[in-house]
């Protein structure tokens, strides 16, 4: 029983599934349905690797976009980023579906002997699934940070473009209007008159293309926000449930340890009692022998 209780805590909460969950699967893979369970965990883990690569790719594309000054180049980057964000959404929804499937299987697995709610196997499955949910929530949060960075740096780029063309810093309301509408021709009217329409049109086209790119990317990235919120709710709810289970198991461990201590103490007392009983018997035998000798006085019989 101690081994079972101890085994249930081999997976620290919050540990990454690659370092914790899969390792636990290797240790207990053949136990009561865990082998198949951890194969599915590994499938999900590979999807997280894809999300990591896509996040880095999107971050690199975003950095590249900040130095682009031509509309065609901006359009090409936009196309690449939209494709990558679409793939992120597909993977995230796939993972979410697999996690929901694991939840259903975890409930069904409790019907097996030795796998009831709160058992070592059940806690291993629940903790691993919770870890995967937390990982998805954290990944979606990273993409939301990317969305916020794109929005903020888009504002900085537009501000620089206006200054480059007009030689003047635009106020916040002007920048807000540009970001909101993408219509910059009115703002650059003076520059068009001074420099000629042809020289300014490239900048106007690039700003419009950038506006469209940021708007479309933000919409797609916001779609991931719902997955983040769903995972946040599940992680909080299931985390609290797991805390309660672990608290109960911890209490059970304490009771078992207390019982073992009491048992050892009882054995020690029993051993000491036997020891003193033997000593008392020996003393009693000595006293009886002395009394018998004193009564019989065998040395007088010899003298007679």
UniProtKB/Swiss-Prot annotation:
Q: Which UniProt keywords apply?
A: Acetylation, Cell cycle, Cell division, Cell membrane, Coiled coil, Growth regulation, Membrane, Protein transport, Transmembrane, Transmembrane helix, Transport
Kindly report every residue range on the membrane side named Cytoplasmic.
Answer: 1-275
Q: Which GO terms describe its molecular function?
A: SNAP receptor activity
The protein's matches in InterPro entries, at most eight in alphabetical order, are given as: SNARE, Syntaxin, Syntaxin/epimorphin_CS, Syntaxin_N, T_SNARE_dom
The entry's note on the tissues where this protein occurs is: Widely expressed in all tissues throughout plant development.
* GO BP, one annotated term: vesicle-mediated transport
Q: What happens when the gene is disrupted?
A: Defect in cytokinesis in embryos and defect in seedling growth.
Compartment(s): Cell membrane
Gene Ontology cellular-component terms for this entry are: plasma membrane
Topological domain, Vesicular: which ranges? 297-304
Tell me what turns on expression of this protein.
Induced by auxin in roots. Down-regulated by auxin in shoots.
What SUPFAM superfamilies has UniProt attached to this entry? t-snare proteins
Q: Show where the t-SNARE coiled-coil homology domain sits.
A: 204-266
Chain segments annotated as transmembrane: 276-296
Protein transport as UniProt keyword: yes
Its placement in the membrane is given as: Single-pass type IV membrane protein
Location of the region described as Disordered in the Swiss-Prot/TrEMBL record = 1-30
Where does the record place a coiled coil?
34-67, 129-162
Indicate where the modification N-acetylmethionine is found in the sequence: 1
Something else the entry says is: Plants silencing SYP132 exhibit reduced root hair length.
Q: Please explain the role this protein plays, according to its UniProt record.
A: Vesicle trafficking protein that functions in the secretory pathway. Acts in coordination with SYP123 to mediate tip-focused membrane trafficking for root hair tip growth. Functions in root hair elongation by forming SNARE complexes with VAMP721,VAMP722 or VAMP724. Involved in cytokinesis. Acts as a cell plate-specific syntaxin, required for the fusion of vesicles at the plane of cell division. Required for secretory trafficking to the plasma membrane during interphase.
Q: Could you describe the subunit structure of this protein?
A: Part of the t-SNARE complex.
**Family to which the UniProt record says this protein belongs:** Belongs to the syntaxin family.
Q: What is this protein called?
A: Syntaxin-132
The protein's organism comes out as Arabidopsis thaliana
